[in-house]
Amino acid sequence: MNFVFDFGAVLFTWKPVDLMAQCFPQRAATPEAAAELAHAMFAHADWNGFDQGVLEMEVLIARTSERLDLDALVLRELVAHIDERLQPIPATVALLEQLHTLRSQHADMRLYYLSNMPRPYARALERRHAFLQWFDGGIFSSDVLHIKPHPEIYQLLQSRYALEPTHTLFIDDLLPNVLAAQGQGWHAVQFESAGQLQAHISAQFGYL
């Protein structure tokens, strides 16, 4: 069985609304305003380009600052250090460790990741977190110039590691990404919590 993990909001904390509230308190003075500003920044084509590896950080900062009328220095400080905000989620890391331990007992079990992640953040996570060595492989979007939920990135992971779709479970917090994986014939589950994921793996596949 192949288990394919997303990173943001699955293995690592990702709270864009909180980021906006902390960095731009006047513009994001209410939860609603913070959510609106977060969507305007992180759901925009420019951020997707940064995720995809086709837009450089400085270009992203300049465009976003002008488009959303945000202080460029504050925005640069935010964007340059987002990798430091991506902290491991202990419960999910513990579940990953359980799967890593089980892997030695099951010859057909493999662990992979598939993450939309700008190149600077991807390299920082690789340097900081030894548990990423538990994975047998994976793909960061910025390294291959494709992003979820576009089918090409799923197909690339599948071909690179010879994944059998019916023996692959994809785990992501965003429904469009889950549906895209299912469109490739993979099993997929929308992540809510480590407990929910553990129960799903146990019930559907007999592990854990």
Identify the function of each model-found stretch.
Residues 2, 75-112, 151, 194:
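Short, acidic loop-to-helix structural element flanking the phosphoryl-transfer center
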Residues 4, 114, 170-171:
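Generic enzyme active-site microenvironment
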Residues 46-94:
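Metal-dependent phosphoesterase signature
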Residues 18-22, 45, 59, 63, ...:
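Alpha-helical elements of Rossmann-like donor-binding domains used by nucleotide-donor carbohydrate transfer enzymes
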Residues 25-32, 67-70, 104:
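Acidic, Ser/Pro/Thr-rich low-complexity regulatory regions
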Residues 1-42, 183, 207:
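Active-site neighborhood of HAD-like aspartate-dependent phosphohydrolases
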Residues 6-9, 53, 113, 138, ...:
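Generic structural signal for small/hydrophobic residues in well-ordered secondary structure
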Residues 118-119, 123-208:
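Asp-based, Mg2+/Mn2+-dependent phosphohydrolase catalytic module
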